[in-house]
């Protein structure tokens, strides 16, 4: 009788240990990307693009009130992708056209300027710099945040970045235009 009871408890203990190990693995896998910087996550995704895409980093632009840089500009036959990055942690909420958005997470509530508007400033500056009518496609990449509201197709999580590029397949620029853009942006 004692042997049956002890075997019973050993089975229960083993089952609980396996269950605990699975829970720990599940929780750790959800946070593995938090150990990687947002810039590195975006860079890894952009490195997966094929040879049709030329990725330029930290493109310097002149704004109305000084200078700034665009984290990434991707030149391709399908357009010029203007990639801004948002590295905030937590849940992001707000209205697509609102000036400010809310970030809630880990006991901290903060307000940020609308990243879509910031990206629009980059596009306006690029239009002036390129001095041509070219297809500029905005994309704001959120690396560690969950988007609570729908901010439109230009706001994507880092995991959807490849899909975003795959959705743009219509050829809009020739090679001569691409090379001219790359030359201007590298100045």
Which stretches of residues belong to each language-model region?
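Surface-exposed interaction regions that form or flank ligand-binding interfaces
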Residues: 1-69, 74-80, 86-94, 100-187
């Amino acid at each position: 009788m004692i042997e049956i009871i002890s075997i019973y408890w050993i089975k229960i203990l083993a089952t609980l240990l396996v269950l605990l190990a699975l829970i720990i693995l599940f929780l750790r896998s959800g946070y593995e990307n938090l150990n990687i910087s947002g810039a590195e996550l975006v860079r890894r995704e952009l490195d997966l693009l094929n040879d049709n895409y030329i990725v330029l980093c930290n493109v310097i632009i002149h704004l109305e009130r000084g200078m700034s840089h665009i984290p990434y500009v991707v030149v391709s036959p399908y357009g010029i992708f203007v990639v801004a990055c948002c590295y905030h942690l937590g849940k992001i909420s707000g209205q697509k056209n609102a000036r400010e958005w809310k970030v809630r997470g880990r006991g901290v509530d903060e307000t940020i300027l609308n990243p879509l508007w910031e990206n629009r400033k980059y596009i306006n500056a690029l239009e002036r710099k390129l001095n041509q009518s070219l297809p500029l496609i905005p994309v704001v990449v959120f690396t560690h945040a969950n988007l609570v509201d729908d901010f439109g197709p230009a706001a994507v999580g880092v995991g959807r970045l490849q899909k975003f590029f795959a959705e743009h397949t219509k050829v809009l620029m020739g090679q001569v235009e691409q090379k001219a853009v790359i030359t201007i942006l590298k100045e």
